[in-house]
Curated annotation (Swiss-Prot):
Required directly or indirectly for the phosphorylation of drpr which is necessary for the interaction of drpr with shark and subsequent glial phagocytic activity. Together with drpr and shark, promotes the migration of macrophages to sites of wounding as part of a signaling cascade where Src42A detects production of hydrogen peroxide at wound sites which triggers phosphorylation of drpr and subsequent recruitment and activation of shark. Essential for correct eye morphogenesis (ommatidial R7 neuron formation) which requires the Ras1/MAPK signal transduction pathway. It is an enzyme of class 2 (transferase). It catalyses: L-tyrosyl-[protein] + ATP = O-phospho-L-tyrosyl-[protein] + ADP + H(+). Keywords: ATP-binding, Developmental protein, Kinase, Nucleotide-binding, SH2 domain, SH3 domain, Transferase, Tyrosine-protein kinase. The active site is at D370 (proton acceptor). Residues 130-222 form the SH2 domain. CDD domains: PTKc_Frk_like, SH2_Src_Src42, SH3_Src_like. Ubiquitous in early embryos, in stages 13-16 expression is seen in visceral mesoderm, hindgut, brain, anal pads and ventral ganglions. In larvae, expression is in CNS, wing disk, leg disk and photoreceptor precursors in the eye-antenna disks posterior to the morphogenetic furrow. Residues 248-504 form the Protein kinase domain. This is Tyrosine-protein kinase Src42A. Its EC number is 2.7.10.2. GO terms for biological process: actin filament bundle assembly; adherens junction organization; apoptotic cell clearance; axon guidance; cell differentiation; cell migration; cell surface receptor protein tyrosine kinase signaling pathway; compound eye development. Residues 1-47 are annotated as: Disordered.
Amino acid sequence: MGNCLTTQKGEPDKPADRIKLDDPPTIGVGVGVPQIPMPSHAGQPPEQIRPVPQIPESETAGANAKIFVALYDYDARTDEDLSFRKGEHLEILNDTQGDWWLARSKKTRSEGYIPSNYVAKLKSIEAEPWYFRKIKRIEAEKKLLLPENEHGAFLIRDSESRHNDYSLSVRDGDTVKHYRIRQLDEGGFFIARRTTFRTLQELVEHYSKDSDGLCVNLCKPCVQIEKPVTEGLSHRTRDQWEIDRTSLKFVRKLGSGQFGDVWEGLWNNTTPVAIKTLKSGTMDPKDFLAEAQIMKKLRHTKLIQLYAVCTVEEPIYIITELMKHGSLLEYLQAIAGKGRSLKMQTLIDMAAQIAAGMAYLESQNYIHRDLAARNVLVGDGNIVKIADFGLARLIKEDEYEARVGARFPIKWTAPEAANYSKFSIKSDVWSFGILLTELVTYGRIPYPGMTNAEVLTQVEHGYRMPQPPNCEPRLYEIMLECWHKDPMRRPTFETLQWKLEDFYTSDQSDYKEAQAY
């Protein structure tokens, strides 16, 4: 097949070759549009910033210095931050303060704080552009089959089933093949026992030159579509959940919901964010701040990152990451409005992503209470994330009670929750079943032609929506399981996640053995 990629020995300082791509009812937090490019040099922030403490060169120089390499570009958000470019070498001066580290650029000698998930230790496997850490096989397949990747694109990930082993995933035309990388007791790695390697880097170099039994030579590493989300806005705000509302700039109104508006904005004149403003009187600020302290600890790739809040005065502001394509509801309706459609495989994958986020909330004993397509947000590559988790509980009862004509989302709510206010993770499962109908009908309102009062009565008497047009029978069976009258007989989100992931996974994705040619 010829050489597509050659990893040269003796060049450990060569920057990792990552490909950078720019990154009705209630509207979900963080609804957005294409992100504003961050300026290379941040403007003067609205608050006085303490100068970064200077550490003498002698304290960190020498053999024990921690040298890391930048995996992505980063532009300073405050005067405390350090801007850097992908491939730049950084000396870590202090890594004891959580997710933001104090660093010095080896190139410019400037110092400042950096997000720790934007860098990796020099010469480590984490610094390699083909290492994707702990992602599932299904996620590897999705990434490799993106149009940005070509035949021979590959990645290495941690094995899902074998501790200390790895898996190699390779794009072969329109399919993905997987190979187990096993580790020898005495050290080293192999796919086929006839050929062993001291390091994963050597393994990649070998199979880049010669397929040696694989389906194809390894070519370019799988592209990275998204930059990671930082944990909080900056080092300065890591323990400062409440921020000054004067640090926010409202750029463009994105939409209005029942309880407030959603804006595209800037924090500190540097950082694109989504700002949700809650109408005065919607919820008690003290209750919201207490709930926000819990919400900020919920971290998962399928949950919208909550950055900060403004609760000192009303209206309350909620500041989150900005998603490029807005709410799932509007995204689906826009696709249908243009006469287009998505593959059923894509829709089911979106459902699996939502189930993964809800499985995490389930594991944390946390209830969403308002799971619907309007509260799920969409990014590039049909990546979806759950928003507004937990907020419904805080809405004042006179604003959000289960009565006909009120703002309560009757058609998404389990009967025990709508009639008796018995909310649980199992009532979220019911709502997930309704969300599945929104997916396959491109945002159609559930129970078409029925009023809220009719829905309450009919569902209580056993009525369930019929199978939507063009819906896979197996998917409709999952919907019916979600709508079981007995909450305890509804599936867990963990079960829903693997059912939907297995639904997506093709039979051709089994692990392969390297062939002896």
